[in-house]
Amino acid sequence: MGVPSGTAGQAASARLVLVLAVGIAVRVALIPITRGQDFEVWDLASTATLQGIDIYAHHPAYPGGPYAYLPLFLYLELPFQWLAEHTGISFTVLGKVPVLAGDIACALVLAAELRDRTGNNRAVVLGTSLFFLNPLVLYNGAFYGRFDTVAVALLLFAVRLLRRRKRSAGLWYGLAVAAKTFPVFVLPGIVREARGRRIWLAITLTGVLLVVSAPYLSSWRAMMSDIVVYDAVKAPGALSWQTLFIGSTSIEKVRLVGYVLLALYLIGAVLLARALDLDVYILATLVLFLVCSKVLLEQYLVWPMPWLVLVLWTAPRIRAATIAFFGAVTVVGMVANPHIQPWGRSPALIVAGFAVLCVIYLVVLVVDGRRRDSALAPEPNGAQAK
């Protein structure tokens, strides 16, 4: 005898709640343990802002680079920095509350998307678990204190609204770009999907970015220097295969290779938008970025994860390849940490092998996407289906 659909739905909801409860409990345990160098930047930037200092024009004593983003996440941190200063509760704990919220929002939107796309309770629970309980996601957010999932959640929600032809999609996409830079990489696909609403999308996106940046428009040159120039002049680093060139040629030639690859990436992002469904396009564009970026930090590997989960169930022909790539992203992001292995920050075998895997999976995505488009194409006039 089959299980009634209502009972099955309640059981699936209970399992999803359990996944969320376990994930939140693990995060609560990880949050107070430590914080990474990036989190020091959030701490110093929010402290300086509460003191009335323009952090773009007058940098606090950052341990590394500047706060290289538009100020949306900074605004989210301000009330928690104020609470830390007035209650004695550690900012390591309070400052990670928006990060925790980003993780939970990602899980909830991903679960809703899986439910809508598959109608499969098992897919909803398992897919949400793959993201929310992923060790790299846990390390990057709750442990280290990076806020990538805030931007990922906003982008996921914007795409969900865009597919439903909601005018508010532009608002949420603008917030995603204002949180972190990477959502702007998929702009060609967003524009393609927004047929009939492109002018509204442009107005909304521009308006959001102007409103978020308004307090710093008087120092816009300094802000753009921190956001754009700081990354543009970097040498290859971390998990990028371009680190293999360092020491074998001049740093100027290495940077030139990076600029050429950036140009190729921008061209590729436009061409992919003409050929792929939006979900596959976002995933393919982010994977292409992993190949072309001259700096590849483990946090970048979190960006494509929700779309890997979606493609896992919506593209069954390439399920094995998607599972393999998802596993590789997770393992590489964790193992390439010099604190847990002896090969340093950019181990040659890992960075070269991962680049090859990215290229292979990118080809798989494009080929499968084109095959699916061909299968869905209407028959020529007069042709009969076999």
Question: What are these model-predicted stretches?
Answer:
Residues 240-252:
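Short aromatic-rich membrane-water interface segments that cap or initiate transmembrane helices
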